[in-house]
Design a protein with these regions (language model features):
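Extended, low-polarity transmembrane helix blocks
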Residues: 2-96, 103-318
Length: 318
């Protein structure tokens, strides 16, 4: 075979690898868009137009420093006074973000808007996810589901710093930054799992049973089974979870086969958190504003799945 033919074959294979990477990022963007659209639908539930919604927002101020709590209380009072108008605005913003990400020409504007909106909601609506109040727990959505939306927007930004990134999340910010962001997130979850409040004997049991109100019977049965397993085992459960989270955090620094194992573990942990700790984000109760952190953590793991960045036979031929 001539050198020209070999070179042409390599170029074609490189093109296919580039297309694979582009398609992977676009697929993840579309999943993120679907979650934003689900949020918009959930935001339009009747509960969100009631006084109870503003009270739920106000409750996130508890335990936070005054400089953080006062704006939350102000926001809750404002929502109470103008519930219909403001909740309609909230739902519309989320709808526009979802549609904007799904529509390729507006994806940059929508992702940028989602970062700004997520940061505002993280403070004014989630009380920074309980990070400063001592209430943060991986099983109740720490460090705040909405800040993970912002992280995903950054990692799925349609730009390329390197020609062939090792995983999708590295394309926009580079592998070193992407791995550092992953490390910070999962190590923070490990830290939250080991805080004194979460090591208490009945801590995890209480988190699981607290989500039962309004759930369908089958989900209550699942949660009750999980709660019984961890009854009085708060310390052991916290240590076990923290170890798993540390393994996940370090996984993206390993070679692809080991990294894939760590990422599968991340998806499994995200699923366990979502089903048993977050009760599917409360989306079946009529009061859930979003699916919570579980699906977002799983989506994040997919963004770090190793891509095939070398052309088969290329190194041998060289």
């Amino acid at each position: 075979m001539s050198d020209a033919a070999v070179a042409g074959g390599r170029t074609a294979r490189r093109g296919r690898l580039g297309t694979e990477a582009r398609d992977a990022r676009r697929a993840l963007q579309l999943v993120l868009a679907a979650i934003w659209l689900l949020d918009a639908v959930l935001q339009d539930q009747s509960f969100m137009y009631s006084k109870a919604f503003s009270q739920m927002i106000g409750g996130t101020a508890a335990g936070n420093p005054g400089v953080i709590a006062r704006p939350i209380t102000w926001n809750a009072n404002l929502v109470e006074q103008h519930a219909v108008l403001l909740n309609t605005v909230f739902a519309t913003i989320q709808l526009l973000i979802g549609l904007g990400i799904a529509f390729r020409p507006t994806v940059r504007v929508a992702l940028a808007g989602s970062i700004a909106w997520a940061c505002a909601v993280w403070w004014f609506g989630e009380g920074l996810g309980g990070v400063l109040s001592g209430a943060a727990n991986p099983f109740n959505g720490a460090p705040g589901a909405v800040i993970i939306y912002a992280l995903l927007a950054v990692l799925l930004w349609p730009a390329d710093r390197v020609a062939r990134a090792p995983f999708t999340a590295a394309r926009a910010v580079g592998a070193h930054v992407a791995r550092a962001l992953w490390l910070v997130l999962w190590l923070s979850l490990a830290y939250f799992a080991l805080t004194p409040a979460n090591r208490a004997p009945q801590a995890l049991n209480g988190v699981i049973t607290a989500m039962e109100t309004g759930e369908p019977g089958w989900l209550i049965a699942l949660d009750n089974g999980a709660a019984s397993l961890v009854r009085g085992q708060g310390l052991a459960a916290s240590v076990f979870l923290a170890v798993a989270l540390v393994v996940i955090a370090a996984g993206v620094y390993l070679r692809p086969p080991a990294a894939k194992t760590a990422l599968v573990l991340a998806v499994v942990v995200a699923a366990v958190i979502w089903v048993f700790g977050e009760a599917l984000g409360g989306i079946l109760t009529g009061v859930g504003t979003d699916p919570n952190s579980g699906p977002l953590l799983a989506l994040l793991a997919l963004a770090y799945w190793p891509l095939r960045t070398t052309v088969p036979g290329e190194e041998k031929a060289a």
